[in-house]
A protein has these predicted regions:
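C-terminal transmembrane helical hairpin of 12-TM major facilitator-type secondary transporters
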Residues: 291-336
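Cytoplasmic helix-loop-helix junction between adjacent transmembrane helices
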Residues: 117-156
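Helix-loop-helix hairpin linking two adjacent transmembrane segments in secondary transporters
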Residues: 142, 150-199
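Extracytoplasmic gate region of multi-pass secondary transporters
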Residues: 42-43, 231-275
């Protein structure tokens, strides 16, 4: 079995605090925008694909979700394999793989062939989203790390917004081929830039202890080890409730306002989350630890959901209430990614924890929307508020439970 370091809290590791390399940080973050666009480029092109493929809405939806299924199934495996490959190498491979696959998708293929390429693209996506936050933490100072990880957490929502703004012109210019070629070029250019600026890896004890043959039994045992560890699992077990909430609310809240208002609300909701994340979220992490920040975030989400009940039917006020609610969600993702570094000082452990967050993050995005859809069908808006409060309570409870386990373990060592 692969051993995992037991002294994870950062205060137990006396290391010099390097200055932040902002060039690398912003390039890695820009690469994250491109990784999120692997979903967004299909989402904004569904009308085009309806004219190309006669597969129904479920089949079209699978063009989007099949990329996430790779992370759902192989998230932890990615966290195991990436340290073996090398963090830098895995990230650059992911970028070039994404560029190549996006270029191949620019050719009008049969539906099944496109699905195969999308699944392979999911593997490149996994390499990027697991290695990315590790590189961000590696090249940031301890003082700046909370802000840096919050910046990383914004990549998904911001990318969707940017793709929605840029894609229409590209689709008008040359259809999906133009959009996919542009995405391929973006990933290739960034891949070259990162290959040039990322320093070569330094072999550490952490890397040496993972240089062991892997088999299915070892991978399954490591799944158990990760999800029973209060350090390795904390970020992922708290994050899954956020992703379930966030995507579900983005999908269904606009349905509660007049049709004329829906497009504007759909575009504004992720922006509210991003603004809060990059302002209040960053400030909070300067003064309180990430676990408390996540808990505060979930409390604010639960409280912010209540006004929805009293403002339904008053679209202007209801829209403000929706923006406040989505703004409250912006605290949780940055604090959750900051947990990866604060609870796991060892880079191999960070890779394992990041693999878990990729796995459970995809679980949340996959299950949250259909759960909320079923609740709305039976209970309407009141069910939506109950859904938000339940998921928030689960996020708070799991973090309190895991914090208690970590405290008990540390007291036993003392």
């Amino acid at each position: 079995m692969i051993p995992i370091s037991r002294l994870r809290p950062g205060r137990l590791h006396k290391k010099s605090d390097p200055t932040s390399n902002w060039l690398i940080i912003f390039l890695v973050w820009a690469a994250g925008l491109g990784a999120a666009a692997q979903f967004g480029k299909i989402a904004v092109s569904l009308d085009e694909f309806r004219t190309i493929y006669s597969v129904g809405e479920v089949g079209l939806g699978f063009l989007i979700s099949c990329v996430g299924l790779v992370g759902l199934v192989f998230g932890v495996a990615g966290g195991i394999l990436i340290p073996l490959i090398g963090i830098r190498r895995a990230f650059v491979w992911g970028m070039f793989g994404a560029a190549m696959l996006s270029a191949l998708q620019a050719v009008h293929l049969q539906y099944f062939a496109l699905i195969v390429l999308r699944i392979l693209e999911g593997a490149s996506h996994l390499l990027i989203v697991v290695a990315g936050p590790i590189l961000m933490a590696r090249h940031s100072s301890v003082a700046a790390r909370g802000a840096v990880m919050t910046l990383w957490s914004s990549f998904f929502g911001l990318s969707y917004m940017l793709v929605a703004l840029i894609a229409p012109a590209l689709l008008t210019l040359g259809g999906t081929s133009a959009l996919f070629v542009a995405h391929a070029g973006y990933m290739c250019v960034l891949g070259v830039a990162l290959w040039r600026v990322l320093p070569p890896p330094v072999v550490t004890d952490s890397a040496q202890r993972t240089k062991k043959p892997l088999d299915l039994a070892t991978i399954l045992r490591l799944h158990v080890t990760i999800y029973t560890s209060p350090w390795l699992s904390a970020a992922a077990l708290g994050f899954v409730f956020y992703t379930g909430l966030y995507i579900a609310l983005l999908t269904y809240l606009p349905d509660f306002v007049d049709t004329v208002q829906r497009t504007g609300l759909s575009a504004s909701l992720p922006l509210a989350s991003i603004v809060t994340s990059l302002t209040l979220g960053v400030v909070m992490l300067r003064f309180i630890d990430p676990v408390r920040a996540v808990i505060i975030g979930y409390v604010l989400i639960a409280v912010s959901a209540v006004p929805l009940i009293f403002t339904l039917g008053q679209d202007a006020v209801f829209i403000v209430a929706c923006l406040v609610l989505l703004g409250a969600t912006g605290i949780v993702p940055g604090a959750s990614f900051a947990l990866l570094a604060s609870l796991n000082a060892d880079e191999t452990d960070r890779a394992y924890a990041t693999g878990a967050i990729a796995q459970l993050g995809n679980l949340g995005t996959t299950t949250g929307p259909p759960i909320l859809a079923a609740i709305i069908a039976q209970f309407g808006l009141s069910g939506t508020v109950a859904f938000v409060m339940l998921f928030s309570a689960c996020g708070i409870s799991i973090h309190l439970f895991l914090a208690g386990r970590r405290s008990k373990t540390m007291n036993q060592r003392d």
